[in-house]
C-alpha cells in the first residue's frame, strides 16, 4: 500500500523521488529513509499534516537575527515534500530572495508575520562592466556581506532622487569581497541582463551595484505554476533615495524568456498564481510583478509605497483578476495597475487606488492589449491621467477595453487618455471632485468604435475640450 501526501487543499500527491515520471517501491523506500534521517521536522508527522513551519528549520523571527539560510531551507523543503509552508508571527530578516516553486502554498498569521529585507546598499560602478563579468569594482564596499543578493541595474545617472530606470538588471550572490581593490565577486554571469528585448549590452558606468532584491521570487529556467501566497506582510524596506531595481518587486514571477517587441519565446513557464490577504510595503520596484503567461488572482491585498507600480502584468499576459485591493503609491511614478505589453482578459474590479502617477496604465512600451475590464474601482489623487492607454501604435493597435462605474476624486489631469484603440466603452464613471481642472477631460484619438456615455463629469471654464476625438471614427 502506498500513502500519498495530503496538501492543505486536500489533494493527494504520490511521491516521485527520482523525478522519472513514475512512482515505485524504490521511491517510497527513499522517501521513508529521507523522512527518518533529514534534519528538521521533515518526518511522517510533517507529511501527513500537510505543512511544515519555518521554525522547524531554525528561523527565529525576532527582527534581528538573519533568517535567510533557515528560510531558504524551509522553502526548499516545502517544495520538495509538496507540503504547505507556515510562517508564524514574527519579523524575519532576509538578505536574498526566497525562491517560489510550482505548487507551493506559503502563508502566515496576517500582518503579524513580516518578511523584511535587509536594508539595501548600493554604489555606482566605477568602470564599464561587460555582460558576462563576475567581478565589479565599486566606489566603496561598506555594507556588503558575502552571501548578499546583489543586482546590477541602470541608475540613469540620477541617484539623488531614486529615478533610476533600472534596465538591464542582473542577479547574483556575492561570493567574495576584496577590500584592497574595492572589488566584489559574485556568482552567476550577467547575460540574463542582456536587455529588455534580448540585445546584448555592456553595463555602462552609470550602473549601480545594489543589494536590493525581490522578497518572494520565481526567476529561473524552472517552471513555476500554481503558487498560493496568503496572510503575509512583505516589507521591501526601501531606503530614502534608493535607486529602483527592475525585477525587484516584493513578489516577482519572471520566466526565463527570449523576447522582443514582436516575439516572446518562453524557456520556462509561470502562471496560475493566487496572492490573497497580504500586506506589501516599501517595494524597490513593483508591489507584485507577474511577467509570465497569465493566470493571476490578487485579492484583498494592501500595497503601499511601491517605488513603481502596485500590480504589474506583462509580456503577452492573459487572464487576471485584481479585486478588492487597496493600493497607495508615491505620486511620482507608476500606476496602481500596469498593463505591460499585450495584456488580455484582465478584470480590475473593486480596488481602491491612490497617489500613483496613473490609476491604470499601459505606460512605457506596451499596447493596451484586448478584452480588459476596469470597473467599480475608486481612484483618488492620481497625479497624471487616471486611465492612461496612450502607448498603442498605428501598427499595434489596442482595444476591447471596458472602463465603467469607477469613481474618481481629486482629479488633476485628464480622466481618460488613449490612442489607436478599437472597440472601447467608457461609461458610468463619476468624477466627484477636482484638484486641478484639466483642459481635456477625455482624449481618445486615432481610435475606432469608441462609446463614451453616461459619465458624470465636472464642468468649468477651463475645460476647453471635454472630449478630444481627433482622427477617431465611429465615436458614440
Where do the model's predicted regions map?
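Acidic Gly/Asp/Thr-rich repetitive segments characteristic of extracellular carbohydrate-active
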Residues: 54-88, 142-147
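Short glycine/acidic-rich loop motifs that flank beta-strands on beta-rich extracellular proteins
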Residues: 83, 95-97, 110-111, 116-119, ...
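Alpha-helical segments with a strong preference for the paired helices of cellulosomal dockerin domains
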Residues: 14-47
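Parallel beta-helix/beta-solenoid
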Residues: 23, 101-103, 107, 134-160, 169, 179, 215-247, 268-281, ...
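Autoprocessing Asn-cyclization modules and mimics
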Residues: 113-194
Amino acid at each position: 500500500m502506498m500513502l500519498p501526501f495530503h496538501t492543505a487543499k486536500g489533494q493527494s500527491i504520490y511521491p516521485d523521488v527520482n523525478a522519472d515520471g513514475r512512482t515505485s517501491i524504490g521511491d517510497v523506500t527513499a522517501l521513508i529513509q529521507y523522512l527518518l534521517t533529514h534534519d528538521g521536522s521533515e518526518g511522517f508527522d510533517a507529511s501527513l499534516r500537510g505543512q511544515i513551519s519555518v521554525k522547524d528549520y531554525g528561523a527565529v523571527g525576532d527582527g534581528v537575527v538573519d533568517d535567510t539560510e533557515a528560510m531558504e531551507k524551509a522553502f526548499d523543503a516545502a517544495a520538495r515534500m509538496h507540503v504547505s509552508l507556515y510562517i508564524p508571527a514574527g519579523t524575519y530578516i532576509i538578505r536574498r530572495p526566497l525562491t517560489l516553486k510550482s505548487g507551493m502554498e506559503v502563508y502566515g498569521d496576517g500582518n503579524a508575520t513580516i518578511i523584511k529585507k535587509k536594508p539595501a546598499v548600493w554604489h555606482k560602478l566605477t568602470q564599464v562592466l561587460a555582460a558576462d563579468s563576475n567581478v565589479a569594482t565599486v566606489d566603496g564596499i561598506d555594507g556588503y556581506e558575502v552571501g548578499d543578493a546583489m543586482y546590477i541595474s541602470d541608475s540613469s545617472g540620477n541617484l539623488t532622487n531614486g529615478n533610476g530606470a533600472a534596465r538591464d538588471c542582473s542577479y547574483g550572490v556575492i561570493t567574495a569581497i576584496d577590500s584592497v581593490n574595492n572589488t566584489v565577486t559574485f556568482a552567476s554571469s550577467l547575460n540574463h541582463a542582456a536587455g529588455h528585448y534580448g540585445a546584448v549590452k555592456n553595463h555602462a558606468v552609470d550602473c549601480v551595484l545594489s543589494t536590493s532584491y525581490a522578497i518572494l521570487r520565481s526567476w529561473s529556467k524552472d517552471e513555476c505554476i500554481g503558487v498560493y501566497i496568503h496572510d503575509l506582510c512583505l516589507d521591501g524596506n526601501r531606503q530614502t533615495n534608493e535607486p529602483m531595481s527592475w525585477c525587484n518587486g516584493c513578489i516577482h514571477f519572471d520566466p526565463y524568456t527570449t523576447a522582443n517587441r514582436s516575439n516572446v519565446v518562453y524557456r520556462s513557464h509561470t502562471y496560475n498564481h493566487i496572492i490573497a490577504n497580504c500586506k506589501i510595503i516599501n517595494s524597490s520596484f513593483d508591489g507584485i510583478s507577474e511577467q509570465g503567461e497569465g493566470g493571476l488572482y490578487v485579492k484583498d491585498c494592501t500595497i503601499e509605497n511601491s517605488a513603481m507600480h502596485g500590480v504589474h502584468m506583462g509580456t503577452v499576459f492573459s487572464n487576471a483578476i485584481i479585486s478588492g485591493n487597496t493600493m497607495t503609491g508615491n505620486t511620482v511614478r507608476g500606476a496602481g495597475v500596469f498593463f505591460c505589453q499585450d495584456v488580455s482578459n484582465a478584470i480590475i474590479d473593486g480596488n481602491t487606488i491612490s497617489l500613483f502617477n496613473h490609476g491604470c496604465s499601459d505606460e512605457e512600451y506596451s499596447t493596451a492589449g484586448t478584452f480588459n475590464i476596469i470597473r467599480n474601482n475608486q481612484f483618488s489623487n492620481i497625479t497624471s491621467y487616471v486611465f492612461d492607454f496612450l502607448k498603442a501604435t498605428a501598427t499595434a493597435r489596442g482595444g476591447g477595453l471596458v472602463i465603467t462605474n469607477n469613481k474618481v476624486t481629486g482629479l488633476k489631469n485628464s480622466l481618460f487618455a488613449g490612442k489607436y484603440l478599437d472597440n472601447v466603452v467608457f461609461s458610468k464613471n463619476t468624477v466627484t471632485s477636482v484638484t486641478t481642472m484639466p483642459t481635456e477631460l477625455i482624449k481618445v484619438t486615432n481610435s475606432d468604435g469608441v462609446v463614451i456615455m453616461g459619465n458624470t463629469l465636472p464642468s468649468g471654464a477651463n475645460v476647453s475640450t471635454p472630449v478630444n476625438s481627433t482622427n477617431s471614427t465611429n465615436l458614440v
